[in-house]
Amino acid sequence: MSAVTVQSVVYQIDGIDYESRLVFDADIVSPRPGLVMAPNWMGVSEGAERIAQSVASKGYVVLLADLYGQAVRPQNGDQAAAAMMPLKNDRALLNKRMHAALDQLQSQTVASVNSAKLAAFGFCFGGCCALELARTGAPLLAAVSFHGTLDTPNPADGKNIKGKVLVLHGAADPLVPKEQLPAFEKEMNDAGVDWTLTSFGGAYHSFTDTEANNPGVQMYNKTVADRAFAAMHYLLDEVFQD
């Protein structure tokens, strides 16, 4: 029985406090792969923490990234949008906060991380964040997006991606414009990235979110969620093998 532990990690960016969550199996003492998890637009939440715990139980150290600041914990969609949009519109700022989370994952001394085995994954807005972090040339062996947007202001940055990319997309997702898919494919192909895009038929936005219940827009789909997480774990097993 794994003993998954959650600890707060508080740090500053430009004088502002951020509080991420470090999630790991306390029974494992040897260095293990480290993952930065970018949550959906609701930020650090109980739901995001549950996902981080599930992933960490597979033998990873997960840093659930606070991208808004310790004082910002959205309680509804309007608050989430107000916190998210400045980052969506300023990818340099977004990447600064993602890199800070990656730095914290590697520098913390609570759970031993193998710094040669790093990856990022995220959900919705967080999927965009994981891909953008990869586009900066961060030392990631994999970047995984669950029902995230695929656009980037600088498609040429795809050439900076060092690892493999996995996009898990709902074919019926109305919140990811269809024109983003071929643009993303072109970006990846032009950059020579090892990439996979899986489009799940009948799946809407937020298909991994157990609380998503907005018919025709955002809907939890357990079957698709299970397949998507299995795909991520398959990729992580591949890139982290010795």
Predicted regions and their residues:
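N-terminal cap/leader regions of alpha/beta-hydrolase-fold enzymes
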Residues: M1-D242
